[in-house]
């Protein structure tokens, strides 16, 4: 994927959620609902502070994150893959193995 986010932006690929119906049928994709977990594919250089300094982001490529799927999250299709573009502040947590 050839994309470089700017500033404090992060590119995330949503992880598909798998769940089961009451009858035990495995649901995936839209039937299971949208996951708020994903893998970080790319990160920007960092947030520009009032002093002009750049503060590096806490997340890195490969991190599995839980994010707020709200107003500021933009969905884009890049190289036939759907990705999310968000600010680091939209990320709520990093899932540690």
UniProtKB/Swiss-Prot annotation:
Keywords: Chaperone, Cytoplasm
CDD domains: cpn10
Matches recorded under Gene3D superfamilies: GroES chaperonin (2.30.33.40)
Record's subcellular location: Cytoplasm
SMART domains on file: Cpn10
Gene Ontology CC annotations of this record: cytoplasm
InterPro entries per the UniProt record, alphabetical: Chaperonin_GroES, Chaperonin_GroES_sf, Chaprnonin_Cpn10_CS, GroES-like_sf
Pfam families: Cpn10
Gene Ontology biological process terms from the UniProt entry: chaperone cofactor-dependent protein refolding
Gene Ontology molecular function terms on file: ATP binding; metal ion binding; protein folding chaperone; protein-folding chaperone binding; unfolded protein binding
Known function: Together with the chaperonin GroEL, plays an essential role in assisting protein folding. The GroEL-GroES system forms a nano-cage that allows encapsulation of the non-native substrate proteins and provides a physical environment optimized to promote and accelerate protein folding. GroES binds to the apical surface of the GroEL ring, thereby capping the opening of the GroEL channel.
HAMAP family: CH10
Stated family: Belongs to the GroES chaperonin family.
Oligomeric and partner information: Heptamer of 7 subunits arranged in a ring. Interacts with the chaperonin GroEL.
Protein name: Co-chaperonin GroES
Phylogenetic classification of the source organism: Bacteria, Pseudomonadati, Pseudomonadota, Gammaproteobacteria, Enterobacterales
Gene name of the record: groES
């Amino acid at each position: 994927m050839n994309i470089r986010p700017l500033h404090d932006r992060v590119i995330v690929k949503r992880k598909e959620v798998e769940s089961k119906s009451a009858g035990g049928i495995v649901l995936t994709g839209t039937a299971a609902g949208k996951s708020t977990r994903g893998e970080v594919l790319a990160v920007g250089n960092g947030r520009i502070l009032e002093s002009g300094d750049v503060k590096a982001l806490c997340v890195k490529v490969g991190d599995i994150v839980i994010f707020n799927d709200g107003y500021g999250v933009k969905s884009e299709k890049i190289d036939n893959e759907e990705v999310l573009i968000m600010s680091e502040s939209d990320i709520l947590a990093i899932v540690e193995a």
